[in-house]
Amino acid sequence: MADATLAAPAATAPAAAPADQASRLRFNGWRKVVLLLGLALLWEGYARHLGNALLLPTFSATVRALVEGFASGELLARTATSLELLLMGYGAGLVLAALLTALASLSRWGAELLELLTAMLNPLPAVALLPVALLWFGIGAPSLVFVITHAVLWPVALSSYAGFRSVPRTLRMTGRNLGLSAPRFIIEILMPAALPQILAGLRLGWAFAWRTLIAAELVFGVSARSGGIGWFIYTNRAQLETANVFAGLLTIILVGLIVEALLFRGAARATIQRWGQEQ
Amino acid sequence: MADATLAAPAATAPAAAPADQASRLRFNGWRKVVLLLGLALLWEGYARHLGNALLLPTFSATVRALVEGFASGELLARTATSLELLLMGYGAGLVLAALLTALASLSRWGAELLELLTAMLNPLPAVALLPVALLWFGIGAPSLVFVITHAVLWPVALSSYAGFRSVPRTLRMTGRNLGLSAPRFIIEILMPAALPQILAGLRLGWAFAWRTLIAAELVFGVSARSGGIGWFIYTNRAQLETANVFAGLLTIILVGLIVEALLFRGAARATIQRWGQEQ
Amino acid sequence: PQAQAETKELRIAQQFGIGYLPFIVAKERRLIEGEAVRAGLPAPQVEWITLSGAAAMNEALIAGSLDIASAGIAPMILTWDKTRGTADIIGVAALGSMPNVLTSNNPAVKSLRDFTDKDRIALPSVKVGFQPIVLQMAAEQTFGQYDKLDNLTVSLPHPDATAQLLSGQSEITAHFTAPPFIQQQLASGKAHAVLNSYDVLGGPHTFNAAYSTKRFVEANPKTIAVLVAALDAANAWITANPAEAAKLYIAAEKSKLDPAFVEAIIRDPQVRFTTAPERATVFSAFLFKIGLIKRNPASWTELFQAGLWTKAGS
Amino acid sequence: MGVTLRVAEPDPLLSLDGVTLRYGSGASAVTAVQDITVDLAVGDRLVLLGPSGCGKSSLLRAVGGFQPVDGGRIHLRGKPVGKPGPDRMAVFQEFDQLLPWRTVLGNVRYALQRGRGLDRATAGKRARDWIGRVGLTRVLDAYPHTLSGGMKQRVAIARAFALEPDLLLMDEPFAALDALTRRQMQDELLALCEQTGASVLFVTHGIDEAIRVGTHVLSLSPHPGRMKALIPVPLAARQRGTTAFAQLEASLQADLLGEADQDTAPPSGERRHG
Amino acid sequence: MGVTLRVAEPDPLLSLDGVTLRYGSGASAVTAVQDITVDLAVGDRLVLLGPSGCGKSSLLRAVGGFQPVDGGRIHLRGKPVGKPGPDRMAVFQEFDQLLPWRTVLGNVRYALQRGRGLDRATAGKRARDWIGRVGLTRVLDAYPHTLSGGMKQRVAIARAFALEPDLLLMDEPFAALDALTRRQMQDELLALCEQTGASVLFVTHGIDEAIRVGTHVLSLSPHPGRMKALIPVPLAARQRGTTAFAQLEASLQADLLGEADQDTAPPSGERRHG
Ligand SMILES: Nc1ncnc2c1ncn2[C@@H]1O[C@H](COP(=O)(O)OP(=O)(O)OP(=O)(O)O)[C@@H](O)[C@H]1O
Ligand SMILES: Nc1ncnc2c1ncn2[C@@H]1O[C@H](COP(=O)(O)OP(=O)(O)OP(=O)(O)O)[C@@H](O)[C@H]1O
Ligand SMILES: [Mg+2]
Ligand SMILES: [Mg+2]
């Protein structure tokens, strides 16, 4: 029967899964590597078939550019600059999202405000914030942090709040039964209970922070000195150094993969998977 | 005791809430209006205090520009164009997200692929897709639809998949007990069970579709004839017609509010709230 | 028979601004179609597209989504150099000469030497755009060091930079800009001119140029000739009817600008609508000197297609 | 057996006065319980006995402060019952009342820290003690999702007992337990009450359990739950095997089984077998 | 009472052969049940009786195909048990086994449509019938979250019964029901078995229920669950009040209560009261 069950769809795999967790983890890694290799080969093949290095360099050319970029130290410095901005904006976004979501779960007014602000501001592109950002924060890094915050705040708040709202009634009653204060109720009951959704929000926020950073670096007044990886991409794009452009994008992909593997997966494994909140 | 309980935090309001749902709905609307008025007043006040119409027009000036824009028919036409693109991209994104998520819940390989692609592609800015988009779809609308699809696909897929993974074991077993085929299991069990998360993903996808559309309209090329609301914003920005720029943004906000009120709230009320999946 | 081999449709991309007036006139007055008929060719299906920035132009051109791109002369030369042996782009025609001006709202700034660490110079694009290159040329002339001012530059689109400069509430104290923003800023009284690109280049120079791939130009010589003829016709018309040209521009761009204001820009003696490139080699020489291009064209004819060689370019 | 109204206690711990609970509003409103009037003195253990869906859980939730009342009043020590609090610890009917992100020990310890304000060490010690008493020392560090149904309920019981509340609200707490464990839990409950003087509101479907655990039994009519009888359990009846027990059991059994639930029992026309 | 191994059925519906179930791996592995060997003929109703946490639910899940076996084999009609299917309908122990987005009627009808391939109208008719039999006609159009615990379980029971499976897997299905409703459900179960020849695997903590429902009782030892005794229930014992019943009940009671669970029972040192 073990065979039969294993043949069943993975989505419906029995909860006994932890049984061979250790071996599975190794297995997963293996599959990821195969998939990554496959994607790289696909890229290489398509780019060669296309034969237009100005538009789409081969994977190998991109890797060469990446290695050179890191060897020269430029790509590393640019990545560091971007990551610094990103983390500041991400942090600020998380703090604001936490505050807004807390407010929303504490009072009807807060809930209405969160819903309203999310529906109104979330669709606005970063450009829309430009005038206000420049007014409040001036040129350069602080404005960038501001738009990154905007990019992170809404997805995280929306996901978390949706998570809060679907915490089962019994769990809520358990928390209230202990006479918890509002902050404790939020931090010690709602947040862990909504962690799967919060984590999904954090992942999305992270991705949108990147997107926004890159898109905004051009419009938001960065100077050659302080430019991050967006600057690297744009200047190389303007010079048709396409391999470098893709090296920059590949860097973002690599950072994404590392953060996903180390941070988000790790966090999920240490929490919601361990707690049985996720299959 | 009724008083005492009502005084309790809203987040912990008893499940008896549906009791006065009808009266509550009216109440909600009232609060929203108050909040909206407050935000409008804040805008007006701050803009007047600033006294720099070039950077930030007053709310009233923006409304005037909005009314004129709609009266002349231009804003309406632009909005219609944008909405059309948006819906196409949104639709394509949803279909792809559904396919990817289904694949991910059917096989381990699919799951790994989804996780990998999301971690890799989600952080990439629209500009990264430009070469490929141009190659595949040429300049103009199809490319725009392509990047909107990219913007919608990942948040929806990620949220849905997170939702799928946190469907309780008993519910999964119930579905499997009926010997459902894989598509049925996904459509009739996993999807409704994960609806709170899917709805959150749809909301986010909607917002990101807008953001991307506006940002991409110029990068991806439009002709004056076919330009949408992004074109409206850009041309007015190029002419320093700031009130019109904000009228364009206000239009996005209004569309966002309407879609939220009619579509997402309505959908939530007809489903997850009715089914007790959300407090 | 040869005409039939040529393209039936022509996809032309422009950017924002009055610098693209010849394109706008050709579009609105259907000059390309007219010239084609005059040359005995079937009128091509012309599609006019607006794109922002040279990079998107280049990618679209290289991807084959565009037939004719347009950008500042400096980025075009850069692209010409970068694509030698691959996409092989080549200039089709200049889109006129007009000065760009470095303006400032800081009364203390009278010349490049007066900039301090507190000043910020807004440029519409990064590093290799038209204005950054001219600024570097000026810095080279002033300080003997072309990247002397790079640390003061920030990238900000023309309209935003203009708003910032005029607001006086921002760190932006200078802006290297193009018509009509120059005239708007100067007219406001809040900014003054610090540097004129004509002075840097030593005279009138091409601002924008239209370009395509060698392959397209060679496959469609007649169409290209028609295009150049249409641009020449547009330029002639503009010069002859500045008031009407202003009105046409305002109508086509749905601009809120005052027609008299636009007309004044068109009538500005420094502004010349011509398809002949001017001082293109000054740019290429500088770009070669600072190592941005690997080959220094001996003559402007290397940069532009043969159909233009009869013009009095430089 | 008619409705035996409780003589009003002079200084009741808990007093319900004409309590009515409803769900929904307007035409679709469902009345869960109607007009419940009963007092609980300190040390009383009131067992709610009644058919499925008659509103027992709702009533417990109302007393716990989790649910508003739609008619009548609930007073605790003379004051209207307010927000939920650890003075009224509840064991809910559902299996998902443990915090999934805390271990068995963590769940009980956390409740003690927050509900009783104990420091971590003291709370941990007391938690271990109670987890031992419900027989779960083996799974001290297990997360709730790895427990069986009965084990989860025992953790919730240990948590409620450990907090030594004035009033215990227990909603079919022992339903998922085997006979032996159930008896042990009953013993623990009685011992706790004796020791701390706690009062209990207890829902069960077992008549013998009702007699064993309760000082009084409130039997409710089928949906919507109305008071059918309030029966004191004589001390003599508490011992199983005595005639007093047998008599009380028989009378309760007749009360519950005899009057068929017109609402929840299948109409005779619908039944084919049995 | 020793372990009475079942004589192998000639053509068993279900046969468990040395079944062992484990959770986790390596040092942290927990054995839920060990070495269970038993055959079920068509029409047999095997009751699993055993202390909380001894692996009854796990065993049911394994037979249902929801969980892999870690030792031994499970055969259904001679073939290794495969994926779950409507031929083995389960009533789970948890309350959240209804689809929250379907009404009471919808839940049962949907199961009939998918599990039995009936069209909507036929399925609806049969669903109504069964919902009536579990006494829930009143809440036909209610969503699960508005039901009481016992009502939810009854919907699940109606759903399982309506599908008329070959093998019913019932995990403490009547634990949340009052005595009257419980008896009605037992009757429905027995009638259904008689009518369709269904076999049943039934978990309960009630000894009287075990005797009333089962043709055989398998008593399990405390964690990890091993077979302690497999006792056939003589026809004579099925009627409550008979001496055969009383004897069997007493013997089972002694079996369950007598041998204290060394693992789950509180160590004597830890107990302070009672
Ligand atoms: N959230 C709710 N919304 C609407 N009706 C509800 C809700 N909760 C319970 N009810 C209804 O109230 C009545 C009483 O429910 P309650 O859970 O209190 O019953 P109970 O006596 O605990 O039953 P059981 O013994 O089955 O647990 C039932 O008819 C039920 O349908
Ligand atoms: N998902 C799981 N992971 C790890 N251990 C588990 C898991 N599920 C159950 N167990 C363990 O397996 C054993 C048997 O659990 P099971 O639920 O089968 O018991 P049970 O006999 O049904 O108990 P109850 O009568 O309390 O419902 C228990 O010790 C439990 O801790
Ligand atoms: Mg109940
Ligand atoms: Mg169990």
Predicted regions and their residues:
Chain D
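Catalytic Walker B motif of ABC-type/P-loop ATPase nucleotide-binding domains
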Residues: 168-171
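Conserved ABC transporter NBD signature motif
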Residues: 72-84
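A short, proline-enriched helix->beta-strand linker immediately N-terminal to the Walker B motif
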Residues: 162-166
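Helix-to-loop junction immediately C-terminal to a conserved catalytic motif
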Residues: 64
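Short helical segment in ABC ATPase nucleotide-binding domains corresponding to the A-loop/adjacent helical element
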Residues: 105-113, 124, 232
